[in-house]
Amino acid sequence: MKIHLIGICGTGMGSLAGLLKAAKHDVRGSDTDVYPPMSTQLSEQGIEVMNGHRPENLDWQPDVVVVGNVCSKDHVEVVAAQARNLRLTSFPALLEELFLRDGHALVVSGTHGKTTTSSLAAFVLAAGGRDPSFLIGGVPQNFGRGWRLGREHGVFVVEGDEYDTAFFDKGSKFFHYQPKTVILTSVELDHVDIFDSLEAVKAAFAKFVALIPHDGLLIVAADSPGALDVAKSAVCRVETYSVGADIHADWVARPIAQRAGGRTVFEVEKRGEHVGTFDTGLPGAYNLANCLSVIAAASGLGLSADEISRGIRRFAGVKRRQETRGVAQGVTVVDDFAHHPTAVRETLKALRGRYGGGRIIAVFEPRSATSRRAIFQADYAEAFSTADEILIAPVFHPEKAPAGDRFDPELLASDLRGRGVMARCFTEVDKIVAHLADSAAAGDTVVVMSSGSFGGLHDKLLSRLGDAVVPAGPGDLGGLRDLLDEAKLDYPDLDEHLNEILVLRDPARKVVGCVAMELHGDAGLLCALATLPARRGEGLGWMLAEAALGRARRRGARRVYLVTATASDFFAEKFGFKMVERAMVDAEILESSQFRGVSSGTTMVLDLDS
């Protein structure tokens, strides 16, 4: 089928384009914001992207034109498609038509946690050998993209959104998703541009859960009154879940230990019977609830507790969900999508648990349709009150909210100061960066909260602070090759392993250090640690190794190996590595190209569980 996507560079549309291409459709599209990384990803898949919207973009006579909910009926390509009698459809309707009718749709729905929970569900199923398909509104770190085409007619994990579908279909998107198993994380007032009350939101969710067939399964959060009300409309089996014993539920998780790197060990029971012990690197009680819902769903799909446990342990999270963008001068910069007061509160609570030693500085951009309106003005003051300092940007496109119903940043700052919290408003991103560069200290965590790019604040701040340890990108390849060549270190297929590499950039964005952390099952291999000769003796090697070990902990490694010819004392004294015989090294590490490529040196191991 020939398929044209209007707005193809959006996160959702771009993922749909990749899924359609993998399914052997002829896919093209248009957009006004054609820039990396999405433009690069589409190009690499052989998908043509037309820059700008114009009637002639449809000259190739597609069989169907996909319209996003940001398109109005007078959009130039919509008008052109109708004039040419081309079929118009929506993203959800096409997904239903081509992928969801004949398989088992696992739909993750709710006001909060959809992206993380659906990403975790997809990874647990994949790690358990079930070969799922998925389409998710974010980028799971373990997959590197928001879509996957798995076994035909198998399980399809999809993030179920209650937002409206298109200008010609005002029903919620998830009405199209043919649900068989549903996770319902929470139901609160959100999307206030289309829902005027909590009752209206609940009505949409109630209609959705009523679509689950009698032999389906609804897994619902027992601590969400709105979700429990909605569950009464289900005709299928309903199972509830909760963290802790305070609320009665079918599935219960109880934290039993905290480990290094913010990992949590927890036990799970189903109706009083022990199911298993699990370990996650996702921070916060709300993420334990997300894990528990996936355990319930995966169990319903036939996975064993051991299979589920392996997937949960190795899950690395989702981009823009408490994602560490880099560490510079001891300041950790975190990116988070939180823009609803509940999400803000839970994110700050989780970060306090993970980075409790220093200050938590929240930087907030009221950008979403919900956050730019005044309905949650008082709730934001309560939600942000647990941070040590709040920096507030102007409302993004304020004209999209009525003047009498518009969020007021100055009022929020005043309310927070009245609670004893440092709070300031800024008119420009560069002024926020300058303030943070002058005031943030080693040990502080800066969490940037926005549903958009926020003017590139993260990268600007890391660059301004200098000597930032960040994930490597395509623009670092030249500097990486030069650095590794100078250090006489070989790293084959460097461009294919960028996601395993961290780099340290100076204020001019030059690569002055690097390290790789390869993960093989429960074990990691620290390798390719190098710094520029001119910068040696400044502690850069320690910074890089510390960041790599932190990444290994967050991604579920139990132990990390390395081979060194000259630095065994350094790794023993600074991190606690111990010498080990090569015969005792994990088989997957022994078979890795990096380990096999080192013929001499001392082999060392660090136990991350101790």
Predicted regions and their residues:
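A short beta-loop-alpha structural element at the N-terminal edge
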Residues: A468-L480
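ATP-dependent carboxylate-amine ligase
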Residues: M1-M38, S43-V49, Q61, V65, ...
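Walker A (P-loop) phosphate-binding motif
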Residues: L5, L19, F91-P140
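Acidic, Mg2+-coordinating active-site environments of NTP-dependent enzymes
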Residues: S39-E44, M50, N57-V67, C71-S90, ...
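Conserved beta-strand in the GNAT
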Residues: V503, K510-E518, A523-A530
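Conserved acetyl-CoA-binding loop-helix of GNAT-fold acetyltransferases
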Residues: G537-G550, R554, L562
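Conserved active-site alpha-helix within GNAT-family acetyltransferase domains
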Residues: R554, R558, A565-Q594
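A short, internal acetyl-CoA/4′-phosphopantetheine-binding micro-motif in the GNAT/acyltransferase core
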Residues: L529-R536, T566
